[in-house]
């Protein structure tokens, strides 16, 4: 798919599992289990899916998945089945040294684990020629998180990037270029970054953990992981009507069944119109 100057690719690097109840908050299991059935430990399947944008001048990657620095205990807890983000890129014909920009939505381990890697006994940035765009306020939060979300941050995923002077700290909404805008949300975690690319005809919005899967399109379907769930709902009420009116493509990082959808108005709110506009 092409939007403006950019060719668009979905980069799927693997699968993992999280507790279904935590993923759907107050929504009863009898409802969410129909959408994403749980295993014997109440865990549901989730994907790690990045977005790659290619122009003549830039190769932009949005989020980097789980990476491969974890141990066997971590792998077992989260039922990780993945390849490195580097191998996932190779499957599409690209190599990590080509990446010029890495936009990190936020620093939870399932979004930025692939940002660093082991090399010769040292943890180094995976994309050595890239700038990593991270909101400064979110980086500061990740260094001193709350008791609720501290388990979501692994400092080896992001401190080495700072040590190698590859972070481009950002502050609020901004534009990467004339076609790419970065929009913040703060219900899930402070200063989460969402990429929006448009050429006036087609628009893609990278949902991150504001709307982690297509099953989370209904307003009340909000994760227990969210620090401020009422803010999440208000942010969804701002994004989804615009996505409907302008026929945006919503791109999902964690949906195990579909990478992207457009939405329509249904009897109970917004619902899926088209699926997999950007194939994995």
Predicted region positions:
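Metal-dependent catalytic neighborhoods of phosphoester/phosphodiester hydrolases
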Residues: 75, 112-122, 262-263
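Short, P/G- and charge-enriched loop/turn segments at secondary-structure junctions
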Residues: 36-41, 120-122, 182-183
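Active-site metal-binding loops of divalent metal-dependent hydrolases
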Residues: 13-14, 64-67, 107, 137-138, ...
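Metallo-beta-lactamase
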Residues: 80-94, 98-110, 126-184, 234-247
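Cap/insert and terminal regions of metallo-dependent hydrolase folds
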Residues: 76-83, 87, 198-280
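Residue-level marker for buried hydrophobic side chains located in beta-strands
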Residues: 60-62, 103, 132, 204-206, ...
